[in-house]
Amino acid sequence: MPNHQSGSPTGSSDLLLSGKKQRPHLALRRKRRREMRKINRKVRRMNLAPIKEKTAWQHLQALISEAEEVLKTSQTPQNSLTLFLALLSVLGPPPVTGESYWAYLPKPPILHPVGWGSTDPIRVLTNQTMYLGGSPDFHGFRNMSGNVHFEGKSDTLPICFSFSFSTPTGCFQVDKQVFLSDTPTVDNNKPGGKGDKRRMWELWLHTLGNSGANTKLVPIKKKLPPKYPHCQIAFKKDAFWEGDESAPPRWLPCAFPDKGVSFSPKGALGLLWDFSLPSPSVDQSDQIKSKKDLFGNYTPPVNKEVHRWYEAGWVEPTWFWENSPKDPNDRDFTALVPHTELFRLVAASRHLILKRPGFQEHEMIPTSACVTYPYAILLGLPQLIDIEKRGSTFHISCSSCRLTNCLDSSAYDYAAIIVKRPPYVLLPVDIGDEPWFDDSAIQTFRYATDLIRAKRFVAAIILGISALIAIITSFAVATTALVKEMQTATFVNNLHRNVTLALSEQRIIDLKLEARLNALEEVVLELGQDVANLKTRMSTRCHANYDFICVTPLPYNATEDWERTRAHLLGIWNDNEISYNIQELTNLISDMSKQHIDAVDLSGLAQSFANGVKALNPLDWTQYFIFIGVGALLLVIVLMIFPIVFQCLAKSLDQVQSDLNVLLLKKKKGGNAAPAAEMVELPRVSYT
């Protein structure tokens, strides 16, 4: 754009563009503005009015404790004056002073409780695949942390088992159950090598019990997913027998849909269904006793009912979670969430007890079971675990608990809660007073273009100094409040970088083929999550200054109640009433990222920068310097002539005044203006 004719240079514009090029450009701008206004309206609709709580005595006590901690940290002696100043430092500063945006934090260093309503499969590996089935855990490490305090929230009832006589609220009590199955004897003289006799295998393991007030033995018919076939149809008698009398029966992944048994958690709603009982309401002991000769004089357990005897093998106790239906009489159409491998984890809490065919003594088999990444197990004493439902959310806390990835018989006196490392969280961060940008080079051009203009250059200096003073002033007094609420983007970025480098997952592959395949599967699943994170990162416009987190262009309303963000970080993902709907936030971030993709007009920005640099050409500024010089010269001339003119005017005024006085004296009576004696004729002076 050519220089302005009246003096100061201006920035570039598109006023000189032709009409054909200008109209589509303006239409695109209007379309973007309309879309951004729609997104902003969605953000405002998602905002929740903060809940005003009345000040209570415990709030004042907590405030005084924070003030005392401030004095202790700063090593200031405590008295009434310093305590009052510390209270002001805690109450006064705002949580953040700059711009706040939502940041995408992949694989954060936090754990969320896993609810029974979670559809993600939980894999369990064991060291006794012969007697528990499943996959071996030869490749994994077993880790145990020190005592930790855990706090979390869940949309559904958390997965919790109690291996002790005491059961926390919301947990399931486990009990020792007997599993029976029979295999044929070997007789090479018979067709197929099968003899006329049967060999009974007796296995005791801990699972959900079928006795007690929280168990209903009344069979009910349910519609199960197709992957869980009917046992009597899918697995026939002796279908897997290979002629080895020493080989134990196999675990069968099937169910009896018309013979379900429900279990209720202590003090909570919801049902856990087990369809692995061939005879849930009838004791099979009498049937076995009637065929005592067929089973080699086998005697069933005394004082223990038998409900899990199946000839084809041991049926896996697949548990199905059912939320409390609105109509208790209409359970057939309620959705069920399967959990196929958790029974192995519960069984490992005690030794397996095996009685082989033909043996009189029982054999104790030590067992361990481990969960795979990203899951872990929270172990704690039942009296130190608290699960409370508030509204539609479950609040979980555990004091002096330990985190581990494996269970064995040492957990017999504890309760266990399944936790999970989330794939990502959305965290509001403060980026200070700098603007949001996703390209450093383009932002540099913008800075340079803005600084070219003289008025904006001076304003930028003033605002920069003011912002620096504000940051330095607020940092000292806002430290305590800042750590309780929103962190800066730099802090979160450094934290995640350290966690990523320190907690990078190592996978050790064992020589055994099956263990290698299991490890490879875990690696593939983890890589799949990493690929999903990379896909999200590539499709989202991120702030250019932070490499280990993605500061998105979606602004965060810092006036909202921090409890909503805290609820999300503790495990709530899809509840607009107490937290944020993460799917809606993700969609908003995606929409804003799409708007930012085409928002930068590189050609226009380059043209603007070129015009601004051209405006700084000294040759173009010569006319302004000439005008300024001429004006200054005229000002100097005026200042020099003004005293002379003023002196002449003063003399003229004096002469006029003298003439007026003489004229007045002549008009007086008495003749001449002066006495005759005093009148003296002055000599005439000739100048020639």
From Swiss-Prot:
One of its GO terms (cellular component) is virion membrane. Keywords: Cleavage on pair of basic residues, Coiled coil, Disulfide bond, Fusion of virus membrane with host cell membrane, Fusion of virus membrane with host membrane, Glycoprotein, Host cell membrane, Host membrane, Host-virus interaction, Membrane, Signal, Transmembrane, Transmembrane helix, Viral attachment to host cell, Viral envelope protein, Viral penetration into host cytoplasm, Virion, Virus entry into host cell. Glycans are attached at residues 127, 143, 498, 557. The chain crosses the membrane at residues 625-645. Residues 455-456 form a propeptide. GO terms for molecular function: structural molecule activity. One of its GO terms (biological process) is virion attachment to host cell. Residues 1-98 form the signal peptide. The record marks 138 as: Involved in binding to the cell receptor. Residues 99-624 are extracellular. Residues 463-481 are annotated as: Immunosuppression. Residues 646-688 are cytoplasmic. Residues 457-477 are annotated as: Fusion peptide. The record marks 454-455 as: Cleavage. Residues 1-31 are annotated as: Disordered. Pfam families: GP41. Residues 20-31 have a biased composition (Basic residues). The mature envelope protein (Env) consists of a trimer of SU-TM heterodimers attached by noncovalent interactions or by a labile interchain disulfide bond. PANTHER family: ENDOGENOUS RETROVIRUS GROUP K MEMBER 113 ENV POLYPROTEIN-RELATED (PTHR34313), ENDOGENOUS RETROVIRUS GROUP K MEMBER 21 ENV POLYPROTEIN-LIKE (PTHR34313:SF2). This is Envelope glycoprotein gp70. It comes from Mouse mammary tumor virus (strain GR). The gene is env.
